[in-house]
Each structure stands twice: as C-alpha cells, then as structure tokens.
Amino acid sequence: MVCLCFLGGSWMTALMLILMVLNPPFAWARDTPPHFLEVAKSECYFTNGTERVRFVERYIHNREEFVRFDSDVGEFRAVTELGRPVAESWNGQKEILEQERATVDTYCRHNYGVIESFTVQRRVEPTVTVYPTKTQTLQHHNLLVCSVNGFYPGHIEVRWLRNGQEEEAGVVSTGLIRNGDWTFQILVMLEIVPQSGEVYTCQVEHPSLTSPVTVEWRAQSDSAQSKMLSGIGGFVLGLLFLAVGLFIYFRNQKGHSGLQPTGLLS
C-alpha cells in the first residue's frame, strides 16, 4: 500500500474551510480567538497501483482533528463535538458530497498518474560495504557490519551467510534510516567469533537490482594479516623508489640535452 499525503489538500478543501469559518450557523466560528490555525490534510491510499484507492480528508483546528471525510464511508464524520455541526451541514449538501466522493478519481488517481514515473517507479541501487567494528583477531568476539546505503524504494532484504549458510542468530538491524534525499540506508550487524578460513557474506536483494549483491569478508590470522600489510607496504615503497628513480633519470636527460658540441655556432 502506498500513501500520499498532501498538506492543504485540493481546491475543494480550501473552499470548504472558507465556508466552515464564515458560515453563520457555526457558533464556535464566531467565538474563535484572534490567533488560531486551520489545517486540511488530504491523504490518498493506493493498493496494487490504482486498483483500490481510498481518499481521506482531515480537518484540523489548533492541532486537533474535528471532522473527516473517508471515501470508504462516503460521508463526513465528526471526530469531536466541534465537528458535529460541520459534518451535519456538509452531509446535507448533495453537491459537496458528490464532489468529495468523486475525489478518489479526480484527485487521487489523477495525481498518481502524474507522479508515478518519479515516485512509484523510481529505482536507485544500493552501495554495500562490509567491515568489522574491532581490529580483527581470531577466536575473539567481533561485530561485522553490513552497511547498505543510498537505495530507493525502502523495501530491501539483507542476509548474512557464513561459509554459504544463512546466519539468523546474532543478527541485529537498525531498521530503515531516511537520508533526507529520497534514499534510505540500513546497517545489519552480525555477532561473530571468527575462525581461520571462514568466509562471511552480506547478501542484498532490492527492486533496483537484477540479481543479489554479495560482499565477502574473510577471517584471517594475525600473521596472515601482517604478511598482507607488509606486502602492501613493500609495494607502496617500491612505487616510491620507482618514482624517485624516474625523476632523477628524466632530470639528467634534460641536463644532457642542453649541452652543445664544441665549435658549434649558435
């Protein structure tokens, strides 16, 4: 189900708010304080696209809802005593009721067609990263984090696998976090006691992906990790010496090119 809320609602909402405030039969309207707030909120609920649509319009006075229209009910209903004369008045006006009942099509289904391409059909692929919370040590408690970020829509499935088998115990999730830019993120953590040679995999399924994304993390001993770091350090050091050597070589070449043979006129 999809819910779209529009603060302020349709032109019909604005018209009825004006009628509600100015209509003499409503004694409470004449006694309103100098400063008050009237809000109308229109909500469209969609199931299976536009197969089933429900329209709800809420009228709020100073943060308290007092009357609403629900398309499933087909008429206005008072929420508080303040809304009772309003509901009775509007339900007695055939034109207003017919327009509200038609709003499911003229407002909800219409707007769905306008915004469907960049809301309902919008797809953004997630970025997946796996990392431990502590410096890796075998046979000690650790926490693996699978960070899934920047995806839309919010429906997503994240699983942890150990050596190809799904892990369910020790899995903790933050739940969906809104990034504020129409994308989401989620952190799914797995409690582990890593053993040498074990492979942990974070598997992500999302509507934007044609196939699941998997990111692996391998448990390594301290010696293996030290060897890997030494290898990386040696590689970087080798690149540094190569860069220095090339710099000296090209500088010397430039110096030789500036010399001229003896006796050559310039």
From Swiss-Prot:
Q: Where is the signal peptide?
A: 1-29
Residues covered by region (Beta-2): 125-227
Query: Where in the numbering of this chain does the Ig-like C1-type domain appear?
Result: 126-214
Q: How does it sit in the membrane?
A: Single-pass type I membrane protein
The compartments listed are: Membrane
Among InterPro entries, the record links this protein to: Ig-like_dom, Ig-like_dom_sf, Ig-like_fold, Ig/MHC_CS, Ig_C1-set, MHC/Immunoglobulin, MHC_I/II-like_Ag-recog, MHC_II_a/b_N
Please give the GO cellular component terms listed in this UniProt entry. late endosome membrane; lysosomal membrane; MHC class II protein complex
Q: Name the protein family.
A: Belongs to the MHC class II family.
Matching PANTHER family, A to Z?
HLA CLASS II HISTOCOMPATIBILITY ANTIGEN, DRB1 BETA CHAIN, MHC CLASS II-RELATED
* Identification of the protein by name: DLA class II histocompatibility antigen, DR-1 beta chain
Native organism: Canis lupus familiaris (Dog)
